[in-house]
Amino acid sequence: MKNLAFCLSLAAGAALAGAASAADAKIGRTLAGQCQVCHGIDGIAKIPIAPHLAGESEIYLQTQLKAFRSGAREHEMMTVVAKELSDEDIVNLAAWYASIEISVKVPD
């Protein structure tokens, strides 16, 4: 019985930890205000050298932001911007840009 109670408490703790670190796209949208000059609040790049972010996977976006933050990937602007982001900021930003649905119209 003690083992069952212990396992249940571990499971509950893991569930609470997951809920605390769940991505929040609304917070990400607020944070994206600093990204909008280059990447757009809608994730569609506003300058030629910036990539579109709309619809990219959360994992990809998180990986790239963490790489910029750590210096594993370098870019004059992104390295500086990413250094100021917490893990939670990165998760929320990735959730925002990943949540944007894009559609493509193929020319006739």
Question: What is each PLM-predicted segment?
Answer:
Residues 35-41, 93:
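The canonical Cys-X-X-Cys-His
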Residues 7-15:
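Bacterial N-terminal signal peptides
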Residues 73, 83-108:
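C-terminal capping alpha-helices of c-type cytochrome domains
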Residues 1-5:
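Positively charged n-region of N-terminal signal peptides that target proteins for export
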Residues 16-32, 46-49, 62, 67, ...:
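Electrostatic cytochrome c docking/interface patches
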